[in-house]
């Protein structure tokens, strides 16, 4: 990062090294001089990258090419001062696939504007592939096999090893469906973390847990700098402050109590039926009780962390918000220590069964929490240094018409470490400007909330009774 600002005139500069469209006829058309805008989307809840490119089509390429949705887009974009291969957007070899021509609109002078949508090649491979075989090994190895063999991907793969030997019988399903099974059931080998995510960012494919993502060192520190603070002592632009300045921000989400109850974020019950021993067991998940045994965005920071809820009794019996397991699960399993439903070539049973009690409730709580956690959308100047799945620091300014006794500089909740859930990259070649719109989230507080002992849910002490009413028909 120290080298990031050296040689830049201002934040958001980029170098468009290559932009070639390979037509279905084999003709290669250079687009560097024709691009009006280029957009790339990366998201930790999307398996592949997608994007759109807007071009000034003076040659009526959409017609004469023609562009029919079977083209390849070769891209290579970099921040001028960044030389590390994993910090360069390089799709010159693993080209994008153009999926559709979304718009052709005539402009003055006989030209036209065309908008093309594209995606990673692996998405197209998935749509035309079927898996109909038995897969064995750890879930992380099965995912790698899907990626390398069935999706024929040669991109970098960041893999966190998972535990135990498993067996998946794939009945004519696509590779992403196999990956989805592995993603939902895998436990990390080192930490038994069930929060695996499979996604593609600008560096490659990832099969990693939320805990692994949270353990990363923050890439950048975003804050809002007044105009006078974005220059150095000599009056020149301070590039790092320019890059890390919050141009715009919107607080987009906060905890949703009703959703968290119904989705099982706060609490859930699970009945696991063992079809081998004809027995069943009950398991209860409690968000408050489990909080400090799980990993959160700020678990790897220097400050203490607290649940994303106020831990106070809501009735005289002392129940808190996590004492109501409204979400119910019913899951089967096969055997205590082995999966007796499948055997290897030597008629042994080396595969461990699916144990939903180890993963399902915890995983579901974390995945659903990502929808209702503390989220903020920020607009900043672009750089190829950060990608979806990274950790950044972000401090939203305190906003209020009065000054508190603490004289806060930053918002009490929206500060510290955040996970990048999604990024929209916009490249404007005419202005040589790269901007990013990022969705950041965090699932913990950095300070405890005051929890008075008798702050119960208010309700009337007396019932107002029931009024029974009838009505007369009109004689039909």
Residue ranges of model-derived segments:
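Assembly/oligomerization scaffold segments
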Residues: 1-128
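Envelope-exposed proteins and targeting segments
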Residues: 17, 49-51, 71, 92-94, ...
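An acidic/polar, Gly/Ser/Thr-rich interaction patch typically located in mid-to-C-terminal regions
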Residues: 40-66, 229-476
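Short beta-strand-centered interaction patches in the first periplasmic/extracellular domains
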Residues: 113, 120-122, 158-266, 282
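N-terminal export/assembly leaders
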Residues: 126, 143-170
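Extracytoplasmic/secreted envelope proteins and their assembly/folding machinery
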Residues: 140-144, 179
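Sec-exported extracytoplasmic/periplasmic mature domains
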Residues: 147-152, 183-188, 394
């Amino acid at each position: 990062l120290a080298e990031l600002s050296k040689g830049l005139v201002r934040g958001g500069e980029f170098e468009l090294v290559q932009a070639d469209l390979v037509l279905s006829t084999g003709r290669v058309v250079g687009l560097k001089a024709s691009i009006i805008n280029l957009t790339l989307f990366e998201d930790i809840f999307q398996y592949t990258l997608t994007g759109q490119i807007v071009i000034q089509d003076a040659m009526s390429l959409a017609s004469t090419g023609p562009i029919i949705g079977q083209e390849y887009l070769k891209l290579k974009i970099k921040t001028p001062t960044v030389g590390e291969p994993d910090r360069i957007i390089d799709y010159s070899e693993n080209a994008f696939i153009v999926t559709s021509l979304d718009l052709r609109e005539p402009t003055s002078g006989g030209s036209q504007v065309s908008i093309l949508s594209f995606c990673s090649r692996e998405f197209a491979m998935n749509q035309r592939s079927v898996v109909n075989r038995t897969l064995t090994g750890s879930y992380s190895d099965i995912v790698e096999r899907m990626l390398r063999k069935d999706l024929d991907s040669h991109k970098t793969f960041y893999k966190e090893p998972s535990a135990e030997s498993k067996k998946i019988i794939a009945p004519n399903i696509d590779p992403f469906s196999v990956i989805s099974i592995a993603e939902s059931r895998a436990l990390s080998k080192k930490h038994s973390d069930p929060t695996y995510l499979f996604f593609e960012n600008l560096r490659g494919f990832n099969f990693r847990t939320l805990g692994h993502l949270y353990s990363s060192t923050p890439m950048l520190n975003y804050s809002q700098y007044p105009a006078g603070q974005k220059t150095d002592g000599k009056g020149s632009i301070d590039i790092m402050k320019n890059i890390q300045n919050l141009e715009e921000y919107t607080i987009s989400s906060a905890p949703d109590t009703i959703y968290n109850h119904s989705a099982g974020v706060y609490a859930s019950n699970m009945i696991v039926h063992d079809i081998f021993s004809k027995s069943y067991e009950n398991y209860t998940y409690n968000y408050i009780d489990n909080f400090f045994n799980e990993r959160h965005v700020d678990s790897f920071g220097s400050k203490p962390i607290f649940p994303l809820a106020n831990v106070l009794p809501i009735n005289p019996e002392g129940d808190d918000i996590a004492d109501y397991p409204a979400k119910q699960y019913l899951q089967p399993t096969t055997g205590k220590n082995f999966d007796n439903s499948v055997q290897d070539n030597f008629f042994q049973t080396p595969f461990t069964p699916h144990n939903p009690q180890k993963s399902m409730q915890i995983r579901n709580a974390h995945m659903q929490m990502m929808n209702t956690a503390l989220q903020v959308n920020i607009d900043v100047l672009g750089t190829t240094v950060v990608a979806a799945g990274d950790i950044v620091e972000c401090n939203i300014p305190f906003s209020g018409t009065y000054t508190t006794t603490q004289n806060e500089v930053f918002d009490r909740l929206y500060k510290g470490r955040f996970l990048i859930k999604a990024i929209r990259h916009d490249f404007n070649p005419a202005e040589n400007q790269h901007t990013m719109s990022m969705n950041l989230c965090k699932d913990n507080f950095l300070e405890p909330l005051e929890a008075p002992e008798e702050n119960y849910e208010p309700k009337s002490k007396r019932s107002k009774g029931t009024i029974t009413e009838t009505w007369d028909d009109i004689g039909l």
